[in-house]
Amino acid sequence: MYYGLTAMKKKSVAVVIISNGPGELTTWVNPVVDEFNKIKKSLCDDDKHDFTLRLVLVPCPNATGKEFLVANSWNKFELITKSKSFWKLLIKPHSFADWPKKGIVIFLGGDQFWSVLLAKRLGYLNITYAEWVSRWPQWTDEIAAMN
């Protein structure tokens, strides 16, 4: 269902990445997470932001079913939620983990509406990466566009 629950520590901010398939994981999620970790390492100890990286895989007809195993092998997330558990997470997020009061949901693959729903449910900000079209701009806090 999920990974890393016992290893999680109390963090002040959650960075939740929404994604769906193998292409999005390797071309978008992995580099974005690497950048977050570079930023975290570059700050001196007094300035470090205490955040947790979490990955939520969402239902997708193009998924291979191995996305969880691939993301888990990177050892970059404190929590990974499988796509088959997405609806349970959306309905009862606190049954999966403790969620910091502050956070951000970043859409990097799947249906953009999933990130809108999860961000609203958790009370977090939402950033949608839109390669071509942002489908829910009225409910998105920020849009990151390719062009």
Spans of model-derived segments:
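Active-site and donor-binding regions of nucleotide-sugar-utilizing enzymes
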Residues: 17, 21-22, 26-147
